[in-house]
Amino acid sequence: MELRADLRSILQYLPLVAQSSSLVWPPSVEEELQTISRGPSESMVNSGEALALHITNMRKSLSLNASDLAPYALQGYGLFFDKKISREESANFFGEVVPALCRLLLQLPSMLEKHYQKADHVLDGVKSGLRLLGPQEAGIVLLSQELIAALLACSFFCLFPEVDRSLKNLQGINFSGLFSFPYMRHCTKQENKIKCLIHYFGRICRWMPTGFVSFERKILPLEYHPHFVSYPKADSWANSVTPLCSIEIHTSGAIEDQPCEALEVDFADEYFGGLTLSYDTLQEEIRFVINPELIAGMIFLPRMDANEAIEIVGVERFSGYTGYGPSFQYAGDYTDNKDLDIFRRRKTRVIAIDAMPDPGMGQYKLDALIREVNKAFSGYMHQCKYNIDVKHDPEASSSHVPLTSDSASQVIESSHRWCIDHEEKKIGVATGNWGCGVFGGDPELKIMLQWLAISQSGRPFMSYYTFGLQALQNLNQVIEMVALQEMTVGDLWKKLVEYSSERLSRRTWLGFFSWLMTSLST
């Protein structure tokens, strides 16, 4: 296999080495994997402590530093498998799952070679090979569920090199942070995240799924181009005559349980996956452990810029759960009955968009409003389906990162091949209190910004989950009043800007809903 450009970009972040135009495990690592694959009667890997010893050996063979692991992570493997789960569960994991994972890892080199052989032909010639998909690089990676399982097995055994990942704005991908002893000793949410992932490994070892998952970096270009939608400025939003889409309000339930075909919003960190592989269990982290295939994107997707979003199609859900934050608990097996599309991806579409953290009063500044509405728009909009209602300024400039003409061409190429896939006219957006909670955003402001972005993108509806937030109790009343006024995207945008100006100048302390109803009634 030739050392292709896509493979070259990611090879230093993989545990394999290139040798005589092939990908291989170092001999000593392959020997360890073969030994463990034969089961605990031969390998003696029958406890968390024994597993930690073999992880240490394999990492030494890969020349990986012990100091790169999270503090006391290997002790954490011992604690979890020897103390936190039952003897029966532990015996099954070491007797069945661990050997199967090692057999899967032994196939990783050949799986990757087959992946690259097909990568240029699956999507009508659009490149879809595993590669570093960096900032301002519109593009897609299409992986089989089997290949994802093997990559996540590498994470479980902590085999990924950590060196230089931060230089490319990549998070750590090994599971050592999950097993970090100081966190897990007193943290039930930590052990429940691990239980979700252990359950996933058990499922795929009993029956390997045969579908595919795509990871797409979507870009809203910052420079003007006559043939695609670029980053709108304030005047563009103010001049929009697009009607507002319909809204369905849900005071209970969860985004991932929505019954329609809709984009399901991941309240993302700018680093895709957030704190999934460490201590947090908020919306993004929970989604990543009940749909573990999302974690694979953390291998090759660096930090998002302000004009970028990440869309993932095809991830399977494996676990049920209850609770949120410190009360999060694994709640057993989940059977995902979503249909498959023509690319054998589940019809689950997750869109990752990161809101501004801790914005304070700064969220009412015009630049912040533009940043947030365009961040949402970059995720919800689809270039090849979008009819331009916004009047763009050809001379528009941006204070953000530049986008080259090559990247602009990638945007067009990246979008065109999905015209045969997405039935965009019927696919709405399922979302909730994006950028609120620990992020500190104003929920009344954020829902309106999302409504604008969803409407302008041509989506037919917004399915909004309030999670019982008291601040949104008057939401239905506001929606009815806006509908009676037959407001457009431009009309609502101008009201948001006017309100935000009054908040900044301390001319009002009302929430946006109360302010808007007063404004419209007079």
UniProtKB/Swiss-Prot annotation:
The keyword Hydrolase applies. Coiled coil: none annotated. One of its GO terms (molecular function) is poly(ADP-ribose) glycohydrolase activity. InterPro entries: PARG_cat_C (IPR046372), PARG_helical (IPR048362), Poly_GlycHdrlase (IPR007724). Its EC number is 3.2.1.143. It catalyses: [(1''->2')-ADP-alpha-D-ribose](n) + H2O = [(1''->2')-ADP-alpha-D-ribose](n-1) + ADP-D-ribose. Keywords: Hydrolase. GO terms for biological process: carbohydrate metabolic process; defense response to fungus; DNA damage response; regulation of DNA repair. Poly(ADP-ribose) synthesized after DNA damage is only present transiently and is rapidly degraded by poly(ADP-ribose) glycohydrolase. PANTHER family: POLY ADP-RIBOSE GLYCOHYDROLASE (PTHR12837), POLY(ADP-RIBOSE) GLYCOHYDROLASE 2-RELATED (PTHR12837:SF7). Belongs to the poly(ADP-ribose) glycohydrolase family. This is Probable poly(ADP-ribose) glycohydrolase 2. It comes from Arabidopsis thaliana.
